[in-house]
């Protein structure tokens, strides 16, 4: 098996294949520059956590991994990021293309196929392709693929965090799996897929598992995000006793974190329901298994066809 840095070349469409020269050899192609890409946040802790995760992934892969955000993070003051400005995707791709780094690998730090990956990323690659025709950008798969039902690694990470958050008071807790919320139905389907996997993994150790979101757009077209977390606590069985809020979040930000919206919603629910004892889990980004999954996604994507320029 070739090393993860080797990219497969495409055979000629017609005629005999010429003998490889050093310039044509697959092994002569330099390793791709790897970008670990998240959505971006105005919260400095998110960028700092992304950098730490990229460093761990780089150690696992044996080559540097650059932390990059789709948007937003470049608006965080550099002084709050240790004096090093955040990178966002479009200028990050162009900077590397100008430097002659023609082989790029985008590793999404996303649970599912958000519009940032299915629309924004291809548009950026297409815009650059006209100016840098040798540029080749490959993209790894998201962390969760409902079509690959046998892959339960993310659900396993969340289950580990739920078990760690359980109080051991006796009665099984209820679990609310909460994500950011999305206008994209396929992203909502990932949350529900994970909720089903989580229920299967936890079994009789919990009394129920419910998927919920932090936010949604108005209108019935976005009802797949329901219930919102604040409403979930008002459902039967979720407003009393031990309830573990399982964070389907990768990095700290406005919603997730010790002083985020999730914590405030839990505190408000506790005031409404006197017998409620809510607890929250660690972020998925804190689980050591995430680096292994990202490394697998990275190696797999080295053989993918480049995005169309």
Feature locations, PLM:
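Extended amphipathic ligand-handling, pore-lining, and cofactor/metal-binding catalytic surfaces
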Residues: 1-309
């Amino acid at each position: 098996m070739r090393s993860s840095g080797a990219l497969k070349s495409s055979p000629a469409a017609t005629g005999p294949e010429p003998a490889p020269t050093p310039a044509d050899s697959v092994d002569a192609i330099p390793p791709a520059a790897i970008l670990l890409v998240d959505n971006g946040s105005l919260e400095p802790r998110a960028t700092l956590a992304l950098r730490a995760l990229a460093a761990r992934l780089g150690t696992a892969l044996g080559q540097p991994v650059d932390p990059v955000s789709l948007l937003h993070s470049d608006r965080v003051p550099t002084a709050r990021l240790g004096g090093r400005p955040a990178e966002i995707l479009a200028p990050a791709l162009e900077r590397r293309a100008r430097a002659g780094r023609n082989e790029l690998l985008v590793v999404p730090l996303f649970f599912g196929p958000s519009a940032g990956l299915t629309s924004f990323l291809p548009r950026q690659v297409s815009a650059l392709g006209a100016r840098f025709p040798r540029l080749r950008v490959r993209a790894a798969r998201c962390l969760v693929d409902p079509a690959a039902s046998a892959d339960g690694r993310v659900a396993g990470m969340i289950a580990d965090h739920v078990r760690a958050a359980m109080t051991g008071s006796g009665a099984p807790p209820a679990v609310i799996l909460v994500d950011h919320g999305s206008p994209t139905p396929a992203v909502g389907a990932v949350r529900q897929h994970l909720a089903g996997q989580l229920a299967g993994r936890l079994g009789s150790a919990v009394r129920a598992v419910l998927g919920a979101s932090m936010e949604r757009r108005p209108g019935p077209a976005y009802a797949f995000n329901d219930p919102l977390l604040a409403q979930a606590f008002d459902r039967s069985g979720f407003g009393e006793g031990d309830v573990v809020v399982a964070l389907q979040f990768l990095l700290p930000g406005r919603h997730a974190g010790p002083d985020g919206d999730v914590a405030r919603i839990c505190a408000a629910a506790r005031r409404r329901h006197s017998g409620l004892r809510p607890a929250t889990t660690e972020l998925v980004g804190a689980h050591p298994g995430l680096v292994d999954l990202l490394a697998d996604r990275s190696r797999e994507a080295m053989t993918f066809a480049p995005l169309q320029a």
